Amino acid sequence: MTRYAMTVTPHSSLFIGGYAHAHGESDGDTARDATSMLIPGSALKGALREAAFRLVNAAGCGHETLRDLFGEAEEEGALRIGPLRPVEDAPDLSLRHHVSLQRATRQAADQRLFQNRVTAAGYGLRFRGELTTSRPLSEDEQGLLESARQLTDQLGGGRGRGLGLVSIDLEQIPVPPFEKGGLGGISSEPGTIVLTLTAEEPLQLGIVKDLSNVATSKGYLDGSAVRGAVAAALERLGHHDALDVVLGGDHPAQFGDAHPGHLSAVPAPLTLREPKAGGAPSDDAVALCAHAAGGRPSSRRHGYRAAKGSFALDGGGWQEVTIERRMVTRTARNLVDGRAADGLLFSLEVIEPHGLCFYVPVTGRPEQLEWVVQAAGADLFVGGTRSRGFGRLRLADVLTESPLASLAERHQRWIDCLKTLDAQRPETTGALLAVGPIAVDQARLLRAFERHDLELIHGVSRRQAHGGWNRKKRLPREVGSCFVPGSTFIVQHRNGESALDALAAIEAEGIGPGRPDGWGRLIACHPIHVDCFKENQG
């Protein structure tokens, strides 16, 4: 992978639409986010591609080099450009008036006056970002990129009105070599580390898209997405043998789902409810278990609703993790010439990167963990529209200690809570919280518990389809669905013995397929059940 520092110097005002919400005093604002104005990587990459397209058409050759650099339909190119931000403090936006043109006559339309807020000209404004290549560029590719850089002198909208005059500079950034085996803190035995990944760019973590022109984003990072990003990073770095070490064999490295906000963040258990008027959440897992184990019944609280999203342990207790989202507008590309297609707009919901951290648990052998850390150190790119400046994650830290107490301590706290409700033999019970999808049906789930002499005595779970193939192939729901993260299963040992060993085995092994991608992961007696337990006698 090669990195370039890219600097864009405007010589006139800039207006890049479709990214920022319009100000109350204008019809449209140039691209900006919660921090500052910016140049989206997609806008700059589109301008470079347009210049390169003119060059290869004029020369009559080089179309293959153009495709390798900028990509084509369903194939990602070698170049990606992140958002560019001002180097110095930028002045306030200035208001600029313009009229709309009639498409038929190309004349000014009557009574169609617009006001846009654009960057101020003449203040020495500069934008800086990073251009990366997924592989070393050939001599022809470097020549085409350099020629396109020199030819690109306009950017954004209103170029026919004198806006968007720019100059672009590129400077290669040296990448320090990685010394394998020099990572401290990783045990010599198989274990688990937690990668702390900070978002450097907006994220579009898509779900199965509906038929509309709006693509929404979920609020957490799949283990499969991180696993794929690690594989792509190892390939960029040229460590092809490491792919088999990390991802192949009988015991590949396992990547868990990453929730934002805090190291303790987990998907909201389906037993967790929050007051409609606001306040601390309440969890029903202990009460449900006590009722099933012969304890005192607890009536249902009123004025509560099911909690959703991710929850993390804050100083004042368990709180919902809030992330900032925004909608951006994008245009589809014409496959013939690569230019924006007329009338084909779509909206993307993205997650703002500022202050956003993901904590990714990775389990494997020491050699696997070292390769994973090396790949993460070269930046990971996840989610959709990565080539348009979305999805870059930077490794901030590697944690080797679990945020959870030992299972023995968690199980003892669970027992102590059940005793307050007069539950019979509380040591034989436990709760299993799914922190990843569980891809088994009800019968296979019960058999998995039976192998450890456990039986399901209660639970709150939900199943959902996990792919677009279900509708296309008309698969039965029990085949193409899974238990969603947050499903809670309350179990009891069938022989009247302590459930501690059985819970430990399930927590270590998981249930069902897909463990390398974060599927099948469960946590026994999670602290959120006890911390949010509120006794209610009705």
Where on the chain are the PLM-derived regions?
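Conserved active-site/ligand-binding neighborhood in enzyme cores
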Residues: 1-538
